[in-house]
Amino acid sequence: MADLYEWGGRNADGVWEFDKKRPDWDLPIHQLMAKYGVSIFFQGHDHIFVRQEKDGVVYQETPNPANPFYGETTDRFRSAYKSGDYRPPSGHLRVTVGPSITKVDYIRSWMPKDETPEHQQGEVAFSYTVKPGK
């Protein structure tokens, strides 16, 4: 997690190449975020819910509210995430920012035909808080 290329400086074999590949950069992106106290980073490429943490930085993959596949078995990106909190796709994030704490809620999306007593549109499937960085 956050170890490769401009994010962490290593190539796919784990060899440090940052200085060769990014000669004008002082530090990889992850090291910059850790150094300057970034507490959370939101990323939205894979369209699933995964929360990971490294060196005090929370990496939050953002879900897709229109994903019609609710179960883990249909999620083709699951194997790319070796650690962290994973939840099945289809939902959105509600982020509440305050002066001393930020709360992130994962709100599930369900088509009306797929709702059950256990799974309702708008249910909070996962929550966590993050304190401000330094």
Describe the predicted segments one by one:
Residues 107-133:
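C-terminal/domain-terminus segments
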Residues 1-114:
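Long, structured stretches of catalytic cores involved in phosphate-ester chemistry, encompassing
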